[in-house]
């Protein structure tokens, strides 16, 4: 690396003398905050087409496990004409000719609940029969990029040119961001150096004032040492008193621990069980043969839970198994809400449907342990004491 290059990232060099690109210089001078990509494009004078940009951003950005939906709006943007069904047919034929992968969801797939755009399209269908016959197209970002390169529609050249522009913009923005953070780091170093200098001057000033004061009062260094010895003796006495207080507090803490144990024994009485067993609240997780969401949560009174289990077993899932069951859960809705609020990335939740990020028994066991832990938290009793009150 050359001496005037500070660092390199993705082939981009940061130089001591700063950037040479005029657009990056304009962006750095325009704001003390980091500009996002649309703002950077506007400041740098790069053509910004909000419709084109939004389509690229929504479709080409990787959203993890959820593939982007290629709907009617996207196909219109790509330049396909005619009714939507014909547009999709032409697009899929092009994908097949170029051996580009894609995925289709049907009306029965639970995964459609994750796509608001699909649900909006479903509302426009005339009847239930049309819904059952319809399919919705999904593509991962890399495959969609390949499809763009193979386009031969009225908008294909415009889209390809804008795609190249965006790639150049992304590189420019990355270089701008590196210079921006480097400048912030240098400014922070300068502030730290200035603070250190100010603190040094302050200490030297205080020392000078102290010497002048001691000289004025006739205080010698030996007098100061004697005062320090007296203070040390007083500190030892205070330490001994503190040790005695600490021992008393430990005895008190033991007594409080005994009280806590007694309260925990009574924790079950905080939510007394109903005499009528069918009306007692219950929380159940079943495992079924469903490739999309193998787990399903049922919550409510015992009579309702039994009814749902019987219905599922007789009509849809004869092989279902109960893998988690609370004999008595005073608030099953609260238990399930707390599970969802964890936002644990190992589990995907859609309504009462649950699935793990992979099909391993290990994750299933961890999920059940997590539910058991949340259920046991109903026994927790927390104590907050201020020993100054005793």
From Swiss-Prot:
Pfam family, one: MSV199
Keyword line: Coiled coil
Transmembrane segments: none
UniProt keyword Amino-acid biosynthesis present: no
Record keyword Coiled coil present: yes
Coiled coil (residue ranges): 181-263
Stated name of the protein: Putative MSV199 domain-containing protein 211L
Database matches in InterPro entries: DUF3627 (IPR022549), MSV199_dom (IPR018879)
């Amino acid at each position: 690396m050359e001496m005037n290059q500070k660092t390199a990232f993705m082939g981009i060099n940061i130089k001591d003398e700063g950037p040479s690109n005029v657009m990056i210089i304009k962006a750095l001078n325009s704001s003390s905050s980091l500009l996002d990509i649309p703002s950077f494009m506007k400041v740098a004078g790069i053509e910004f087409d909000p419709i084109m940009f939004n389509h690229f951003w929504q479709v080409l950005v990787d959203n993890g496990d959820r593939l982007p939906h290629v709907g009617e709006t996207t196909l219109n943007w790509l330049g396909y004409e005619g009714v939507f069904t014909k547009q999709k047919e032409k697009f899929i034929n092009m994908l097949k000719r170029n051996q580009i992968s894609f995925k289709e969801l049907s009306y029965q797939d639970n995964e459609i609940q994750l796509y608001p755009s699909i649900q909006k399209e479903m509302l426009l269908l005339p009847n239930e029969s049309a819904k059952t016959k319809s399919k919705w197209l999904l593509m991962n970002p890399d495959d969609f990029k390949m499809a763009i390169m193979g386009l031969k529609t009225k908008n294909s050249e415009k889209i390809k040119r804008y795609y190249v522009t965006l790639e150049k913009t992304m590189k420019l923005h990355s270089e701008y961001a590196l210079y921006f953070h480097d400048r912030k780091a240098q400014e922070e170093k300068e502030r730290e150096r200035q603070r250190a200098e100010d603190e040094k001057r302050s200490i030297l000033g205080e020392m000078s004032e102290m010497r002048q004061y001691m000289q004025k009062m006739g205080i010698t260094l030996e007098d100061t040492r004697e005062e320090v010895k007296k203070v040390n003796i007083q500190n030892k006495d205070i330490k001994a008193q503190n040790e005695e207080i600490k021992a008393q507090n430990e005895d008190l803490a033991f007594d409080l621990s005994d009280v806590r144990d007694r309260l925990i024994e009574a924790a079950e009485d905080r939510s007394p069980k109903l005499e009528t067993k069918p009306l007692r609240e219950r929380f159940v997780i079943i495992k079924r043969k469903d490739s999309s969401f193998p787990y399903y949560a049922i919550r409510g009174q015992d009579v309702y839970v039994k009814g749902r289990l019987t219905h599922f077993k007789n009509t849809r899932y004869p092989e279902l198994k109960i893998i988690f069951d609370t004999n008595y859960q005073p608030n099953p809705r609260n238990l399930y809400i707390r599970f969802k609020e964890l936002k644990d990335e190992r589990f995907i939740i859609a309504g009462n449907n649950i699935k793990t990020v992979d099909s391993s028994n290990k994750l299933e066991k961890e999920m059940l342990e997590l539910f058991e832990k949340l259920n046991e938290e109903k026994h927790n009793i927390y104590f907050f004491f201020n020993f100054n009150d005793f």
